[in-house]
Structure formats: structure tokens, C-alpha cells
């Protein structure tokens, strides 16, 4: 799964042009919902929060293949890293790590870890983007969203 930076950046730029931030509480009525945004809303925007942004970018970088996406997560070539504003123990934001570079809905472009660290601290445990954490968060939020219906 080889992708040059030009194509990678074009995918991110295309997604960014239609991205609209919305808190999970406002969108789903729950504090945390990890979800891939597959389709735009009625206004043509991809709507979600930082976790949704990271997951949705990764999914698109993997040619919209769940198998490729989970392969990258399991082999630690990609990860959804949790970061915080105040210290390495409090989590308040999610960042995509993809093949050694990072992107989030604040920077909106790939860059080094140091770019993210200007505003955030990587969580002492969950800042590495382990696949099990992503799987658990996605599963739990799917169950909660389903039960709320």
C-alpha cells in the first residue's frame, strides 16, 4: 500500500474542503462517539469531531477499505493517538499518526510530531495510537448510539 505524499495531501485537502466540526454531544447526544464519516450531510459537509476526522482521513488514505485500514492500525503503521492540552495524563483530542507523520482537524495537514506538540501533550499510555484502543472506542460508541435509537 504505497502512497506518495502528493496523493496523501490531496486526499486530506479534499476532505478538509468539506469538513465541519461538531461536538459528539450535539451530533449524537453522547460525550464520545468514534465514527468514520462515510457520506456528507445534506449540505455536502463531512460532520464530526476530532476522532471522526482522524478515522475518516485514515479510511480514505486506505482507499476506503476497512481491511487496509485495520491492517495499518494493527501493524502500527497508523494510529489514532490521544493527546491533551494540559499534561500527558488528561485526554481531550485525537490525532492521526500515519506512516511517521501526524494530522488532526486543527493543523489540517501532515507534519512532524513536534507540530502537534506545540499545542498538545501525547498521553502517557494512549498517545501511541494502539489498535485495541481504537477498536474498543469504535465498538463502545456504536453500541451506545444503537441503544440510544
Predicted regions and their residues:
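A structural boundary/capping signal
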Residues: 1-149
Amino acid at each position: 500500500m504505497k502512497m506518495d505524499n502528493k496523493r496523501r495531501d490531496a486526499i486530506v485537502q479534499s476532505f478538509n474542503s468539506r469538513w465541519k466540526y461538531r461536538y459528539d454531544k450535539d451530533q449524537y447526544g453522547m460525550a464520545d462517539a468514534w465514527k468514520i464519516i462515510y457520506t456528507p450531510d445534506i449540505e455536502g459537509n463531512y460532520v464530526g469531531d476530532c476522532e471522526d476526522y482522524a478515522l475518516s482521513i485514515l479510511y480514505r488514505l486506505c482507499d476506503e477499505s476497512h481491511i487496509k485500514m485495520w491492517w495499518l492500525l494493527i501493524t502500527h503503521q497508523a494510529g489514532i493517538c490521544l493527546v491533551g492540552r494540559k499534561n500527558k495524563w488528561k485526554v481531550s483530542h485525537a490525532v492521526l499518526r500515519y506512516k511517521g507523520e501526524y494530522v488532526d482537524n486543527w493543523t489540517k495537514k501532515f507534519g512532524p510530531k513536534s507540530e502537534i506538540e506545540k499545542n498538545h501533550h501525547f498521553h502517557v499510555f494512549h498517545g501511541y495510537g494502539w489498535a485495541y484502543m481504537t477498536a474498543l472506542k469504535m465498538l463502545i460508541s456504536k453500541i451506545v448510539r444503537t441503544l440510544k435509537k
